[in-house]
Amino acid sequence: MKRRACAAAIAAAGLLAGCAWFRPPKKASFWEGRIAIKDPGDPQNNMSASFELQGNASAGSFGLFNMLGLTLASMRWGEGFAELQSGGETHTFKSADAMVRSSLGHSVPLAAVFGWLNGSDANVPGWEVDRSRYAERRLRARKTAASESGVDQAGLELLLVWDAP
């Protein structure tokens, strides 16, 4: 009887210790793949590139590369700074969103992109997200309303295809 009680106590302790070590998987903080932006109002503003995105909306980096792997733009941001390196020049911005706008030529909701890549259902006013192919690591976001500045028109599409982590 004592043996059973002792064995049960050891088994219970083992289970509790096992639970203490279990940690749910963290959301990804690094993605690489392809990005495309389609502007139906001005096809000359369409763009496509490979990308590497790391971090989160508060601090991170975003690199764009041509089909030969050469760097088109390298962006970094953190608390109080946003920096874009492109064409041998470095530019600073007040926000990561302004930096991304300058680099891509379009306003893209950076904070939402991190959420979308992590599978979040985050809704952004003026954007409609198609998550139907998320399991295939494909995402399409479409601008449903023109920006207040008038720079981005409704119909602009952001397409992301990323590799498995």
Which ranges hold each PLM region?
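An acidic-aromatic
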Residues: 59-109
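Short, hydrophobic/aromatic-rich segments at coil-to-beta transitions
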Residues: 28-32, 57-61, 134-141
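Bacterial N-terminal signal peptides
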Residues: 11-14
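Post-signal-peptide N-terminal segment of Sec-exported extracytoplasmic proteins
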Residues: 36-74
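Short beta-strand segments that buttress and anchor functional surface loops
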Residues: 35-39, 62-65, 139-150
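N-terminal export leaders
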Residues: 2-8
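Bacterial Sec signal peptide processing site at the extreme N-terminus
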Residues: 17-34
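Mature, soluble, non-transmembrane domains
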Residues: 21, 91-96, 101-165
